Curated annotation (Swiss-Prot):
Its EC number is 4.2.1.20. InterPro entries: Aldolase_TIM, RibuloseP-bd_barrel, Trp_synthase_alpha_AS, Trp_synthase_suA. Pathway: Amino-acid biosynthesis; L-tryptophan biosynthesis; L-tryptophan from chorismate: step 5/5. The alpha subunit is responsible for the aldol cleavage of indoleglycerol phosphate to indole and glyceraldehyde 3-phosphate. This is Tryptophan synthase alpha chain. It comes from Stutzerimonas stutzeri (strain A1501) (Pseudomonas stutzeri). It catalyses: (1S,2R)-1-C-(indol-3-yl)glycerol 3-phosphate + L-serine = D-glyceraldehyde 3-phosphate + L-tryptophan + H2O. The active site is at residues 49, 60. The lineage of its organism: Bacteria, Pseudomonadati, Pseudomonadota, Gammaproteobacteria, Pseudomonadales. Keywords: Amino-acid biosynthesis, Aromatic amino acid biosynthesis, Lyase, Tryptophan biosynthesis. One of its GO terms (cellular component) is cytosol.
């Protein structure tokens, strides 16, 4: 069983949702980012999404766009992002890591080489936001053949006709974007999320993780009662952006992660 499915299985037995945390690789620099990455599991992260920096992250809001700019300024690239995963795996063999980003850097590296290196580094899943299911053969199919899950985004505008197409070939989990638009935007109403999760569950047996707009332990707890996973990204990235030093960035991210984790873990208690 994959690391992702194993983790969701464990959490189901514990009757709690996963806390899925997002950071951008190399933000604000390689060493600090690696320190944050290595600290996230102990701070309560159950699954980690690691952003692959790209020059044109059009699906992301201002916070993550700025994180991409900081990481690229610090000379982060896809090879270094894979190296970060290798270094993380020296200490942690159980926490799933999902690389999230855009197809261009993968295409430039070469799909075959990228998949081989991702497997060797210990990557568990991919979210590639600009690669629709009509292009499964470009990356989804070969990635899954190599044992890497391919996770799809669904949104409030994904209708019942489109949903089976989007879910075709999905594995690992389904990422529900609770607010149509860019990441980090406002938060959705709980009723809306509950209805959306129920609709997804009619189409898939995969765990559903809900993200976008979750910034507090209370919001995370409310979502954790409704679904298998809570995704937090922009709120963590803001801790890096607002920090006066790299040490403060590390502590800010990990402390917020601890607080949100407490909310998620107490949600169904």
């Amino acid at each position: 069983m994959s690391r992702l499915l194993t983790r969701f299985d464990e959490l189901k037995q514990q009757n709690r949702a996963a806390l899925v945390t997002f950071i951008t690789a190399g933000d604000p620099d390689y060493a600090t980012s690696l320190q944050i990455l290595k600290g996230l599991p102990a701070a309560g992260a159950d699954v980690i999404e690691l952003g692959m920096p790209f020059t044109d992250p059009m699906a992301d809001g201002p916070a993550i766009q700025l994180a991409n700019i900081r990481a690229l300024a610090a000379k982060q690239d896809l090879a270094k992002t894979l190296q970060m995963v290798r270094e993380f795996r020296q200490d942690d063999q159980t926490t799933p890591i999902v690389l999230m980003g855009y197809f261009n850097p993968i295409h430039k590296m070469g799909v075959e080489r990228f998949i081989a290196e991702a497997v060797e580094a210990g990557v568990d899943g991919l979210i590639v936001v600009d690669l629709p299911p009509e292009h499964n053969e470009d990356l989804c199919d070969p990635a899954q053949a190599a044992g890497i899950d391919f996770i799809r985004l669904t949104t409030p505008t994904t209708d019942d006709k489109r949903l089976p197409v989007v879910l075709n070939g999905s594995s690992g989990f389904v990422y529900y974007v609770s607010v149509a638009g860019v990441t980090g935007a406002g938060s959705a109403t709980l009723e809306h999320v509950e209805e959306a999760v129920a609709r997804l569950k009619r189409h898939t047996e995969l765990p559903v993780c809900v993200g976008f707009g979750i910034r507090t332990p209370e919001q995370a707890a409310a979502i954790a009662r409704l679904t298998e996973g809570v995704v937090v990204g922009s709120a963590l990235i803001d801790q890096i952006a607002n920090a006066k030093s790299n040490a403060q960035a590390v502590e800010g991210v990990l402390e917020l992660c601890r607080q949100i984790s407490t909310g998620v873990r107490s949600a169904r208690a």
